[in-house]
Amino acid sequence: MTDSSRVLRIYTPTLGVLALAVLGVASCGLAPPTASQASGGQGGSAGGQIGGSVGGGSSVRQSGGSAGAGGQAGSGGNSGSGGGSGAAGGVGGGGTANSLSGGGTQASGGVSGRGGAGGSGGASTAETRDASPPDVTVDTPPPPPSRGPTPSQTGVKFPFPQNRENSRCVYPYLYRNEDVQAAYNQWKNDTVTSDGANGFRRVKRPNEPGTLESNSTVSEGIGYGMLMAVYMNDQSLFDDLWQYEQKHLGQYGLMDWNIKADGSGPTSGGSGAATDADEDMTFALLMADKQWGGKGSLGKNYLDIAKGMMSGLWNNEIYNYKYLRSWPGADSSTINLSYFAPAYYKLFAKIDTTPTSNWTAVVDTMYTVLNASLNSSNGNTGNGLVPAWCDSSGKPNGGAFGAGSGASPTNYQYDSCRVPFRIGLDWCWNGETRAQSYVALTSKFFNGITVAKMVDGYDLNGTPRAQYQTGDKAQIQSSAFIGPAGVGAMSNATYQSFVNDAYGVLITGKALVGGTYYDESWMVLSLLMMTANFLDYTAI
């Protein structure tokens, strides 16, 4: 081994381990590559591909997009599915900074595939966190994948990307901003439409399971869309989504939760607000004020609108000054713990100066309910698997509204799977020890299962629900489960490998197996958090 050989730490999601790839480039008669030339896939003698960091890996087709080319193999090697084998020391072509990993290009109406776990292609020095890249001369080097804060734009406070890591949390070893951009493009292409949007744009549900009208819009989707748009610096879409929301206000001045595809009004049973949607919109409006200031194309300033939303939330969706209602008119017998967003409420408490508002009391009360739901009767004291619906004592409420897609509200299902994300934010942003204690339970449970064996539904005791034990459903891995579980696991370095694995599955598109709208939404939101782009308002 020569002095110019380098040791590169590479994460391979299929193995779930860190590999040490030795780049003996000088011994093959080549100078080592520079950082600017190590983008997208330098072909060499060892290693697999992940996210464009390692050349010669396999390209994976994203749902709704076109397959990318993968990293180009070195001399004598072949790129493409399965991992092309490059000749020792060969230099691969790589991808451009605005392309998906491995040189796939974005196309209008879709996205190219991201490089998945590769075969024997060459290792690249791009995107490593612990190794400084060597030097090489190449005629036309591709630019490296973007990493680190984007310089401030005029009137924009935190343009994408930022990569502002929080010291309380761990992050995937090889995260890439290109992965987030690709996921966002795909979500936008598949779910955002002007059809039936009253002159603006909306988020549709093109193929969601269940009984809701096809292509309808749920207020939850508008909330998710506003969150994504503000962090991706997409002001035009943000404003359109909000203006669509304003066209569909219900009895309490809050958006009805399910709107017909043609925009003519709420669906049958779609009247009334949903608390999780309203709080996501409120937080997104606060972030819009921080991001852009002013009012954009809206009639009022973002901050003033957010304050109005906080008032609507407090007056209609808080019960007895301390319990989180699931919708206006509900009481403490029908609590959805996946609506509990303590990190938001701590921010609301700093901005909402209304004398009757006490967001701190809501935080404290709802943490008490969350902990009460983990008990010996439920069999979940050690795993953190909360029921979708419960009462204030933590007892599952099987008769609650919104059981969801045939899933019993007494199970850990498509509502409750979001809890580790919302609670994980409170640890990462605020150092809340109650949050840390909770996500320690879910992280230990899912880490013991492994990402590869996670399914889309569990009894509260941790047993996979019957329909997920055998057959095709036993292979289901949706991003709505994997993404939030991965975000929760960011709370402890013990679960670094689980975080890496979760990220690896999200970026391959393997987790897009359920409905397009819900899974793609949680893919983007989780990737934003995992790449340190889902920022804390108070830290900006």
Task: Give the ranges of each region predicted by the language model.
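Ser/Thr-rich, Pro/Gly/Ala-heavy low-complexity intrinsically disordered linkers and tails
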Residues: 25-146
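Internal amphipathic alpha-helical repeat/solenoid segments
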Residues: 170-221, 229-270
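Substrate-binding cleft of extracellular glycoside hydrolase catalytic domains
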Residues: 234-238, 242-312
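Bacterial N-terminal signal peptides
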Residues: 13-27
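N-terminal secretory signal peptides that target proteins for export/translocation
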Residues: 1-11
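Solenoid-repeat scaffolds in large eukaryotic assemblies
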Residues: 225, 234-238, 299, 306, ...
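A cross-kingdom marker for long, charged
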Residues: 472-476, 486-540
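Extended ligand-binding clefts on enzyme/binding-domain cores
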Residues: 145-183, 189, 215-219, 270-276, ...
